[in-house]
């Protein structure tokens, strides 16, 4: 190992905790913000240029988009894990085969998604609760996204390999370029060309095409040690099997998230039609879907940077835990808790007391939707300030190699607690119960995470 690499590793056990946390968290925060922008920018410009019907259409497509992301994650993370191991073993031919097989799998996955999507898209959207008003809008948006599915899989999937080859800034730069392109193209296609909901879809696909082209260009450059090569793109079953097996655990949560969003969309439509009055523009169910689309965009923009901050602490916790520097492990946890809580308390206060101001830009011409979204945000975000308890605890278990406990804690908030409450509460509280399921799951996951963390910390002396 080089002296420089040794010094970098040793700094985990000697450098200032705040400095280390910020050093590793800032790139992760930027990466997460980039991902959040893809979600929030489309809905912002659609709200401005298309209206509430457009927001409802995009929101109905979200479970399918999450499924595509899960497939990309399965191949990208699974392939990259195996790729990194072979790099460490200096088995560069095998590493090249793994990289190229992953590239082929991402393309095949996208083609399969496009074909299946064309067949099942309309039945799925109806199952999620699409009405006669929202189905044409959602179908128009989703059909274009399916057409460009290959770019949605290649861009995030292959970016993992760039990081493993020692170019994290290059990977981040390509993500940022994609996000900035999306903002510019959304404004151009929706606000200037007036392409409506199709403009939002074409902006997303075009920006991902740009990101995919930049990422592919990295792998064909002369100075890239492991390139995309035709002769290594032929699928080898032993590698394909390992890639998929390694990729299933990280993609499983995303698949569960897709399922949860499908149940949520159905619940919003069903109980929105009961609890909300038809406005003439939107039915009660469509209004509930649009309101959730706005709330979810704002919540994602708040949560994803927090996730980046928390995930940035994992290598620091892992190194010091392995080195038995338990005082530094506890110091890292304390620092992370303080800043995560501080950030979330400010965000929670804004959600509670400035809800109207936060939702207004998404529906400038629909006061009823603004009112509904602000009401929903105050319920949905009621326990947001408690989220750091579960997130930091989960990150601790991930960093110390206890992946199953980490998966359990992440699953508590998104699946294990949320889905049962989502299915039960609306029977008693109608639409309010749909939005109340999330804060109850947030609080439950926080208490479970804290209990598990305190139990584990007692073992650290």
Task: List the model feature ranges, each with a label.
Residues 67, 182-186, 212-216, 301-304, ...:
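Hydrophobic transmembrane alpha-helices of multi-pass small-molecule transporters
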Residues 26, 42, 79-80, 120-121, ...:
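Hydrophobic/aromatic residues in alpha-helical transmembrane segments
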Residues 35, 39, 43, 47, ...:
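Juxtamembrane/transmembrane-helix interface segments of polytopic membrane transporters
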């Amino acid at each position: 190992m080089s002296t420089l690499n040794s010094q970098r590793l040793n700094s985990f056990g000697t450098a200032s905790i705040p400095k280390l946390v910020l050093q590793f968290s800032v790139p992760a925060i930027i990466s997460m913000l980039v991902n959040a922008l893809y979600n929030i920018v489309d809905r912002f410009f659609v709200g401005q240029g298309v209206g509430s019907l457009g927001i409802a259409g995009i929101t109905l497509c979200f479970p399918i988009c999450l499924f595509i992301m899960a497939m990309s994650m399965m191949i990208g993370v699974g392939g990259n894990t195996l790729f990194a191991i072979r790099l460490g073993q200096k088995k560069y031919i095998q590493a090249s085969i793994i990289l190229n097989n992953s590239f082929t799998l991402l393309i095949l996955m996208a083609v399969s998604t496009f074909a299946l999507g064309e067949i099942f898209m309309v039945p799925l959207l109806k199952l999620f609760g699409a009405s006669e008003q929202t189905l044409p809008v959602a179908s128009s948006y989703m059909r274009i996204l399916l057409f460009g599915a290959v770019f949605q899989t290649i861009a995030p999937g292959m970016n993992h390999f760039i990081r493993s080859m020692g170019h994290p800034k290059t990977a981040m730069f390509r993500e940022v370029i994609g996000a900035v392109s999306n903002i510019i193209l959304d404004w151009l296609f929706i606000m200037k060309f007036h392409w409506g909901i199709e403009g939002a879809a074409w902006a997303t696909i075009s920006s991902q095409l740009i990101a995919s082209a930049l990422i592919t260009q990295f792998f064909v450059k002369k100075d890239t040690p492991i390139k995309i090569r035709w002769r290594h793109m032929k699928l080898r079953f032993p590698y394909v099997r390992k890639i998929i097996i390694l990729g299933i655990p990280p993609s499983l949560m995303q698949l569960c998230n897709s399922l949860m969003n499908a149940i949520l969309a159905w619940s919003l439509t069903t109980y929105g039609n009961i609890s909300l009055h038809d406005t003439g523009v939107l039915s009660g169910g469509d209004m509930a879907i649009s309101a959730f689309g706005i709330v979810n965009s704002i919540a994602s923009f708040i949560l994803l940077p927090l996730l980046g901050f928390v995930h940035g602490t994992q290598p620091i916790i892992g190194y010091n835990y392995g080195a038995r520097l338990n005082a530094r492990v506890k110091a890292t946890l304390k620092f992370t808790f303080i800043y995560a809580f501080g950030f979330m308390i400010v965000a929670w206060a804004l959600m509670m007391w400035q809800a109207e101001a936060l939702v207004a830009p998404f529906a400038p011409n629909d006061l009823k939707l603004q009112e509904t979204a602000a009401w929903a945000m105050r319920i949905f975000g009621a326990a947001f300030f408690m989220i750091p308890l579960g997130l930091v605890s989960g990150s601790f278990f991930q960093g110390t190699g206890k992946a199953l406990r980490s998966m359990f804690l992440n699953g508590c908030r998104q699946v294990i607690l949320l889905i049962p409450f989502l299915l039960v509460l609306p029977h008693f509280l109608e639409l309010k119960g749909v939005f109340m399921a999330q804060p109850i799951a947030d609080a439950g996951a926080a208490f479970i995470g804290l209990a598990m963390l305190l139990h584990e910390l007692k073992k650290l002396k």
